């Protein structure tokens, strides 16, 4: 799924708690059932079992130097932590978000599940479009960002590793900056959960290829290391 073939630090006590939400596939009718017992599957188990069939979405805000607020929308595939799509707008809407899903997921290459929060921006237009694509939505509980851990981790990485170190002037400058960062994220930034590989896997280079060289990325905020012949 997508064109991609992080170490996730999460709160253990939260991810091991019983799955209690009606939106989880396969557990309808088990919540508050006749036995009064919660279902046995945990949230972590659901995420692990469906990693190959699951994408998540989220918005985050970025203020500019003139105090204008920009909204960034991301779509992330869980299996390889691969960013499938991002876009920036100053006026998000349900229709706009729905169009982003179409651009992120080409026809015939859609996941089974979409994990998202309950933000009002995901209105009827968004839900209708996603349903029409054959995707089943899984909603997190109110005020529970830990239930969307991969998207939250990605957004945290963007802030810590990029946005906290720069000044955003306008929408164009933010797009350029995010393009640079996401190129680094996909092709160079290693993830412990992927065996210290980036989302787009890199082959191990043997010593005979040459000396290790340092290549600046994201305007010098980060670096990539490769072997190259002298």
Describe each model-derived feature in a short phrase.
Residues 1-230:
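Charged DNA-binding/catalytic regions of mobile-element recombinases
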């Amino acid at each position: 799924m997508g064109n991609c073939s992080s170490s996730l630090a999460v709160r253990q006590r939260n991810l091991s708690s019983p799955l209690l939400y009606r939106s989880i596939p396969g557990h309808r009718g088990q919540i508050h059932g006749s036995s009064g017992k919660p279902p046995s599957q945990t949230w972590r188990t659901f995420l692990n079992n469906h990693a190959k069939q699951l994408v998540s979405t989220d918005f985050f805000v970025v203020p500019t130097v003139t105090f204008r607020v920009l909204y960034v929308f991301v779509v992330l595939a869980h299996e390889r932590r691969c960013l499938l799509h991002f876009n920036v707008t100053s006026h998000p809407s349900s229709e706009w978000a729905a169009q982003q899903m179409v651009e992120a997921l080409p026809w015939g290459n859609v996941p089974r599940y979409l994990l998202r929060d309950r933000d009002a921006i995901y209105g009827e237009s968004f839900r209708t479009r996603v349903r029409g694509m054959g995707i089943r939505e899984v909603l997190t509980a109110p005020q529970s960002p830990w239930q969307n851990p991969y998207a939250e981790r990605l957004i945290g990485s963007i802030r810590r590793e990029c946005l906290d170190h720069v000044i955003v002037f306008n929408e164009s400058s933010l797009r350029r900056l995010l393009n640079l960062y996401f190129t680094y994220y996909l092709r160079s930034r290693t993830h412990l959960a992927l065996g210290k590989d980036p989302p787009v896997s890199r082959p191990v280079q043997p010593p005979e290829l040459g000396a290790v060289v340092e290549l600046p990325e994201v305007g010098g905020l980060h670096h990539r290391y490769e072997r190259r012949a002298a």
